[in-house]
UniProtKB/Swiss-Prot annotation:
Pfam families reported for this sequence: MKRN1_C (PF15815), zf-CCCH_2 (PF14608), zf-CCCH_4 (PF18044)
Start-end of Low complexity biased regions: 358-368
Keyword Transcription: no
GO BP: protein polyubiquitination; protein ubiquitination
Protein's UniProt name: Probable E3 ubiquitin-protein ligase makorin-1
Length: 439
């Protein structure tokens, strides 16, 4: 029992004995939480040399003075790794080294007379054993003065390329970088247009491209400012309210008539054109000047200039042309507007519908009339010959009448004003006769 107790008391000393000769790496950086109870040595006099910060050597240490590593550039002797003591060479002599020559029977060799210092061949520190060094062989160095300037020029070009490849700091480009001078990225020059550090100091193409983009953005902002200045006092001709001062933000939009320059808000002009108690030629005309406009263009700003209005109309048509037509339905249906439809007529495979020629015939007054009403006359003749019809037939008739109305709306854009009025008069007469006879 006594022997076991003695062994147990001696065990900790044996286990912790070798650790006291090893310096605590946490204590070296001031982070050891064990304190005096640490089983490693806290004696800095016996520790190795402090580690050198590799980021400081590259010039991009983000910690600065607070870095735990040493901020000193090592000398050339420190860069070469420490080697073990050189052992005597027992193999054949190296190439380029003279063989020992004896002076006499009892004399010493020439190699033994040379000191073991700088004159001796240090094969451990040879170029092929140093990491990262190119192999140069053991031949004697040859001095040449020619390639010196060329090497300097290549070094300058390499440094210039490295400078070009540096990326701009994303934080400094949008505001402020918290790293300041210790930032690993490049802080660009301040742009006079946007006031941000986004100009690369040495990349001229990037500077010109950014300045050009800033000028374009500034021009767009100026156009928007002029549009707001032009639109802020415009008053709707129906509700007599300033469009930009409406209570509901969704109603602060203009309804631009295609053939008229009078100002209306989009809600009022759409309500005017959807009225049922007036004739179509009345609701399609301007409430003030009575000029007929085939469509209304929604706009956030007021547009009065002819060129700007044409650009707005073309932009509106291009935007509508990207949406598929629900009447065409990818070729499964028929669009009453035909080639005059603003929406996209495309088949499932992506092919666009080819415009079909419109069949026309001459009327009694010498003007061309659309033959699309013939289907309605056939329908009326069929209803006259039949006795009565149920609700399904009535719904079908209403559908045919609505389709005929859409056809006439589309056809009215091709004819002049007088011809369009004749079309509408004839259509209303057909409707009156039909409702008097059957409904």
């Amino acid at each position: 029992m006594a022997e076991a107790a003695a062994a147990s008391t001696a065990a900790p000393a044996v286990i912790g004995g070798w650790t006291k000769h090893v310096t605590c790496r946490y204590f070296m950086h001031g982070l050891c939480k064990e304190g005096e109870n640490c089983r490693y040595s806290h004696d800095l006099s016996s520790c190795k040399q402090t580690m050198i910060c590799k980021f400081f050597q590259k010039g991009c240490c983000a910690f600065g003075d607070r870095c735990r590593y040493e901020h000193t550039k090592p000398s050339k002797q420190d860069e070469v790794p420490s080697s073990k003591p050189s052992m005597p060479l027992t193999a054949a002599p190296l190439a380029g080294t003279p063989e020992p020559v004896s002076d006499g029977p009892g004399g010493t060799t020439g190699a033994q007379e040379k000191p073991q210092g700088s004159g001796a061949v240090d094969w451990v520190n040879a170029a092929e054993f140093v990491p990262g060094q190119p192999y140069c062989g053991r031949a004697d160095p040859v001095l040449c003065e020619g390639p010196g300037p060329l090497i300097e020029e290549e070094y300058e070009k390499e440094q210039a390329n490295k400078e070009m490849k540096k990326q701009l700091c994303p934080y400094a480009a949008v505001g402020e970088c918290r790293y300041g001078l210790n930032c690993a990225y490049l802080h660009g020059d301040v742009c006079d247009m946007c006031g941000l550090q986004v100009l690369h100091p040495s990349d001229t193409s990037q500077r010109s491209q950014h300045i050009r983009a800033c000028i374009e953005a500034h021009e767009k902002d100026m156009e928007i400012s002029f549009a707001i200045q032009r639109s802020k006092d415009m008053m709707c001709g129906v509700c007599m309210e300033v469009v930009f001062e409406k209570t509901n933000p969704s109603e602060r939009r203009f309804g631009i008539l295609s053939n008229c320059c009078h100002c209306y808000c989009l809600k009022c002009i759409r309500k005017w054109r959807s009225a049922k108690q007036f004739e179509s030629k009345i609701i399609k005309s301007c409430p003030e000047c009575r000029i007929t406009s085939n469509f209304v263009i929604p706009s956030e700003y007021w547009v009065e200039d002819k060129e700007e209005k044409q650009q707005l109309i073309q932009k509106y048509k291009d935007g509508m042309g990207t949406k598929p037509c629900r009447y065409f339905d990818e070729g499964r249906g028929t669009c009453p507007f035909g080639a005059n439809c603003f929406y996209k007529h495309a088949f499932p495979d992506g092919r666009l519908e080819e415009p079909q020629p419109q069949r026309r015939q001459n009327g009694s007054n010498g003007r061309n009339r659309n033959t699309r009403r013939t289907h309605l006359w056939d329908l009326l003749d069929e209803r006259e010959n039949s006795d009565s019809f149920d609700n399904e037939d009535e719904e079908m008739v209403r559908f045919e009448l609505s389709e005929m109305l859409l056809m006439l709306l589309a056809a009215g854009t091709d004819d002049d004003v007088t011809d369009s009025e004749d079309e509408w008069d004839l259509f209303h007469e057909e409707l009156d006769d039909y409702y008097e006879l059957y409904l």
